[in-house]
Every structure is written in C-alpha cells, then in structure tokens.
Design a protein with these regions (language model features):
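Membrane-interfacial loop-to-transmembrane-helix junctions in polytopic alpha-helical membrane proteins
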Residues: 55-58
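ATP/Mg2+ or Mg2+-diphosphate-binding catalytic cores
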Residues: 72-116
Length: 116
C-alpha cells in the first residue's frame, strides 16, 4: 500500500489508510493508547461525534472488535513464532480477556444498542 504525495512515495499499513470505518481507527487508538474516559470525551467533542448516541455505540463495538482482532492475531503469532511465543501469547490472552470481561458486564448489551 503506497501513497504518492508531492512526488514522494510512502509505504503505509492498510488499516491506517482511511479505508476502514473511522470508528474502528478511533476505537483502536483508544484501546492501544489506553485513552482514559475523560480524554475520550474530549476526542469525541473535537471530532464532533455524538456522545451517548450511535457514534458512541459504534466506537464501543469497534473497540471490542479491535481488541478481539489483535488478540486472535497475537495468539496465532505466538503459536507460530517459537522465538517470541510467550510474549505474543500473553498479549493475545490480555486482549481476548478484555473482550470476555466486557461481554460479561451488566451494561454490555446497552453499550451496543443502536438507536436508529
């Protein structure tokens, strides 16, 4: 995946090329950078996203999907890569556990209830 800009060529990752939902990118950013709730609210405001509405539901959904994606990737990588298997397996376990614990909370269904 390449971008040509002012005569220069840049190699980019596909998931960060803007082809995915902005909510996946935003959810992944918050997850990977451990964004606190107050910081997330500031970002929502700056990005003109709807707090407490469908925008927040989509953010929640993609945050969990991002964690599951990374968890499955790391687990697979840990099984296949014998040199670093423990690190990747631990990362996979952490990411999948995050989703598992979220699914088992009382408000999980409410977090994913679209209003439209």
């Amino acid at each position: 995946n390449f971008i040509l800009l002012d005569g220069d060529m840049y190699l980019i990752d596909w998931e960060y090329s803007g082809m995915e939902s902005k909510f996946f990118d935003f959810g992944d950013l918050c997850l990977q950078q451990n964004i606190e709730e107050n910081e997330r609210k500031e970002l929502f405001s700056a990005l003109e996203l709807e707090e407490g509405g469908d925008d927040q539901v989509l953010w929640n959904l993609y945050r969990y999907l991002s964690s599951l994606t990374w968890g499955l990737w790391a687990t697979r990588k840990g099984v296949l890569d014998k040199e670093t298997d423990k690190d990747y397996l631990n990362l996979g376990k952490t990411k999948i556990k995050y989703v598992y614990e979220a699914v088992n909370t009382e408000n999980f269904e409410k977090q994913l209830s679209l209003k439209y």
